[in-house]
Amino acid sequence: MTNKFNAKKTGVFDSKVEKFVYGKLLPLQEQGLIRSLRRCNFSFLIIPEIADYTIVEKQLKTKIKRIEKKVIVERAARYTPDFIYFDCETNEYVALEVKSFITRKQHDYPLRRKLFRWRLRDHNARGRSQWRFDEIEF
């Protein structure tokens, strides 16, 4: 199966290059240089949703009940890296993205990447677990 960027899906991976990178990371995990390697199956919130609240009147049998209803104005923006793992040498979690030169420049990826890096910097400044964003360009 080919997607719009002509990347051929290889089983669970979105491209041959992702599969290749995963194959290179597995020996590092076996050597103990990294741990907890996994394909990222969750997304990070980079911009929360924007919602308004309106009062809705609901007719009951004997009275009118007012209910506050949440209306989503803008959906949340999320970022899903290709892989995440823990780097034992630097004691950092790593979010790894595999992108071609062309897809790196297209659509909303540059903005999402900047927002994700900004979120990680903010997270790291709060003294929590340290995260790093790495990108492999092919």
Per-region residue spans from a language model:
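Electrostatic, structured charged patches in enzyme active sites and in nucleic-acid/phosphate-binding
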Residues: 1-138
